[in-house]
Amino acid sequence: CIETVVMRYHYGNTVCVSTQVGCRMGCRFCASTQAGRVRNLEAGEICSEIYTAQKDIGERISHIVLMGIGEPLDNFDEVMRFLENISSPEGVNIGMRNISLSTCGLVPKIDQLAEKKLQLTLSVSLHAPNNEIRSGMMPVNDAYPVEVLMPAVRRYQETTGRRVSFEYSMVRGVNDSDACARQLADLIRGMGAHVNLIPINPVDGSPYSATDAA
């Protein structure tokens, strides 16, 4: 199964879409990866999430975030077709600046995306400022560690001229120390990036729990 979520804001309606049935990235805090990846969604299937959402709420969708089930850059070709279709006047005509694409950090695909110079927002699921913690949370970090990922993100920003966002799920006793905060600040210094601090949601089978509210 997949999920599609509509979020209403004062500036319009945002829909969060899935790009795969399941996910093979294995992030240890994520429920959607527990059964692995079943298959990629085709571009038309991702588009249908938008059309179905618009039909259900009876209102236009103005913003899209590719942050549902699946790793968008692990389904690169179909996601690129989806973006082309959904942003065209013949589609929903949603401008690229109103689209955000999330990735856990597939560096070759980040570079490939940068070459297209799309004006969307890249949102990097970082969740830790160093390899020791990040590899414990996200197996992808073993292939693309922080010292490889961050230069790729900077290259993306330099190539596209777009601000990058970093997602950081706060996990009690794991990545929420003052030392982690300082390391994170050093990591993104000079980027003009946005950091989204998220209380982690409890997941069955996961040892992680959310940081207490400040």
Region locations from a protein language model:
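Long amphipathic N-terminal alpha/beta scaffold segment
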Residues: 1-8
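Short beta-strand motif preference
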Residues: 4, 15-17, 122-124
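Conserved alpha-helical substructure of the radical SAM core
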Residues: 34-63
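Conserved AdoMet/S-adenosylmethionine-binding subsite of the radical SAM
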Residues: 54-63, 68-213
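Canonical Radical SAM [4Fe-4S] cluster-binding loop centered on the CxxxCxxC motif
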Residues: 8-45
